[in-house]
Each structure stands twice: as C-alpha cells, then as structure tokens.
Amino acid sequence: MKNKMFAIAMLATFAAPALADGIPVEPGLWSITTTVNMPMMPAPQTMTVEECMTDEILDMEDMSDDDLDPNCDYALDQLDGNTMAWSIDCPVEGGGQMHAEWTATSNGDSVEGEGKMTMSMQGQTMNMDMSWVGERIGACD
C-alpha cells in the first residue's frame, strides 16, 4: 500500500506538469515526504524517500501520450506562476469511477502539494487525502 501511495505522490508531484509547461522543478536529488489519510487506515501513513530527478524525468516535452493512461481524462485547472492545479478522471475496473484533484506549488528547490481522490465502485466510495513536501537536497550521485 505504501508503494502505491508513493507512486501516486510521484505522479502528482512530477509527472502531472505534462499537462502544461508545468511549474519550476530543478533536477537533482530530492527528499519527498508524503502523508496519506484514508478512512480504512487506522492512522495517516507517512513515508519519506529520496529520488534522483534527472533532466530527462523532468523534461515534460519528452513525455508522450503513451506515458498517460488513455482511458483517463486529464485537465489543467490552473497554472499561475509557481502553482498549478489539475484533475484526473478515470474509469475503475469493474465499472467504477475515480476522480482526483491536485495542487502543487514549487519554487524550483522545494515543492508542496495536496490532493483528494475519490473512487466509487459497486456502491462503495473510498476517499483519500494526500499531502507532500519535498526539497532538493543536492546533486544526484
């Protein structure tokens, strides 16, 4: 579960700028702390990782439609200086729907954001709140 939440955080933080020119994020070694809160978890789950974000990873012009789920709709809701907001709507296997709204603010060497995801399937609804903070801590090895 933690790895899935980290993957969602990484997508939300770094891949989502593919929706537009994005916000400033400097390449290098990043420390990212993600906190996920879901009603079915006894307490919020927090995870900190270090990730090397290279020019290639951050170059959104190199990202193709193949990198995005073709079944999902992606919308850039706001891009204003160093802040962006976007949403994603995807069908869920078994006939459900997932909707997520994300915001992120970056000054190049730090980033913070939050998101809310709602998944509806077979009459059940699951909500997830997530926040993250990250900072560039140096060059990649």
Describe the function of each predicted region.
Residues 1-7:
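Bacterial N-terminal signal peptides that target proteins for export
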Residues 21-141:
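Subset-of-secretome marker
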Residues 14-20:
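Sec/Tat signal peptide C-region and signal peptidase I cleavage site
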